[in-house]
Amino acid sequence: LTGNVYSPEGKPLADGYTIINKGGVKIGVIGMVTPNITRWDAKNLTGWTVTNPVDESRKIIDQIKGKVDVIVGVMHMDIDNEYGVYGSGVTDLANACPEFDVIVAAHGHKSIPNKMINGVLVVENKNAGATLSEIHVYLERGLNGKWKVKNRTSENLNMKDYAPDPTLTALLASYDERAKADAVTPIGQLVGGDLAPANEIDCLPQAMIQDTALLDFINEVQMYYTDAQV
């Protein structure tokens, strides 16, 4: 999903697209990431160039549209733009590139089972694998022998209703254990009492209604690592 990210040498971090052949149907899959990663990961992107997903997708579509039957966008971008940056949301992408049959959005961490934007079917899922989109693309073969998309439907499935896939679980086991071990690694020790006082009202954290040492600590850490002058 980094077809619009280029190294300091001008080489793409990954191919912007791939073509999958399923049962004689050629599916072009285009992957991009929001250009706003330059805001959040600036230190890790020194010298790298992140281009606009709309421009990159347009170039790829013009290159492959005569070679594929279905065009799918897989984008780490929300529905709407962020920070007023054109092309950072898939709405701009669908409006500029109506050749997309389906766009799978992300980043917004919300469930959008089926939204039509400029004739493009757009879906998005919740974070942490809570939902999964099931998309059906219906095609019809024309007299010239070529496939043509006739309809698209989709729904978001709640993964809590399904048993984990044992094969995928086994493949991810080592990463899962590493993440769990990292999550419980001690990074410090608190002595002398709690950083937040006891709740005065049940179910209402005291930190939400008064200044606390906990919030002061969080803010100090944020300022330290961002060099903020507040």
Could you say what each language-model-derived stretch is?
Residues 1-161, 167, 209, 214-221:
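Acidic, metal/ion-coordinating pockets
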Residues 65-66, 144, 159-230:
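Non-catalytic terminal accessory segments
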